[in-house]
Amino acid sequence: MSSKKFVKYFILLSVIFLGFHIIMWEICTKYVLADVLKVGDLARLSYSNDMVDDSHKDYSIDLPKHHIRSSFYNYRDQVDLITVGDSFSNGRAKAKNRYYQDYIATYSNINVLNIETTYNGRNAPLETVVYMLNSGLLDEIKPKFILIQSVERFTIQRFGKASLNIELNATKQQLKEFFREHPYSLYIPENNIINTGNYRALLYKILYQYQNDAYFSRIIKEDLTKKMFSVANSKKILINKDSILNIKKANQKSIKILNENLNILAQLLEKKGIKLYFMPAVDKFNLYRKYISNDNLPESSFFEMLREQKKDYIFIDTKKILSKKIDNGDIDVYYADDSHWSHKASNEIFSKVLFK
């Protein structure tokens, strides 16, 4: 091949390459990757620009009382309630009034401390409370209540596999330093116009037409029987595939282990005059399941089985509370583009569940 032909082919391929990336970026990818803080995780991972919820552009907090984050706590101010959980407890929804703890503080008129990162293990809230109990840190803080939160789909693997170890030990100073030095943080990738996401975006646009998970996506896309979200594609729902795959983990045996672990912790805390609350955050799939057109999908019985257990703790039944809300026609209880609930859900739950 002559040098002139090589140059021509090189220029042509470069134009095609750049043109593809510019076009895909402008019509799709920039809406889900340009500013990941303003896009929910489900839309971002599925490249569903028609499901992006503009609510993420509003980060305002207009509630009269706010919670305290553990990375800023001085261990002098009064704390009535301590919350320990996952991304739901750390405002991962990235929108207006994103912290449910602020609704607790406002409606119950109490001071709330959130432990942002669990100690000595990822997503280990039960163990973190045991460490705080055995170290004497709870004696120092003197809370009246502790709330353990976990998203439904990961609750069994966190709490329902083995008996809780109540002999865990750490010093108060170790815990204080850890909580101060480990604030909850998000990994924010930087994306330019030329990026591999443009290829995935085109591929997903095609494959989602034939398969609800585009054959290899982590996100499932299904039709709804009625409008549930105020986005361009308001009768579609995005679901985390884990929500479906993990349904079978909730059985009578695992639910019993989960309940026993919570009862053990509740009994230990009761000796200190502390009430334990447990709040599993209902999966988006479970909450909206009866409004999904596809009848071949499984159904979760996690909440139904847990309701039957004898409890020494207070169970916050988020499925029962939020199901009534969506059955009444409320939309955007969860964000269309995200796996987290909206401020509407937090308001609904904690206007009813009061800490007194």
Language-model segments: residues:
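Extracellular glycan-modifying ectodomains
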Residues: 1-356
